[in-house]
Amino acid sequence: MEPKVAALIAAGFAMGIGSIGPAVAIGNLVGKALEGIARQPEASGDIRNAMFIGIAFAEAIALYALVVAFLLIFVA
């Protein structure tokens, strides 16, 4: 197998596996936030702000996987 082909396959795996965790985390986070808002509607603003911060941190992991995939494609 040529090194470029191996790098492309590794980049695909990096994005695929690196996106599973953030997707599950964001799904759980939004579900729990909606559950909290349903229980206590007056706290919806605080819950929403905390949810967006959590989503940003979870999405950062997917962006790191994207950077690794780009490094594998263009540097390797």
Predicted feature locations:
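Hydrophobic, small-residue-rich transmembrane alpha-helices and their short perimembrane loops
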Residues: 1-76
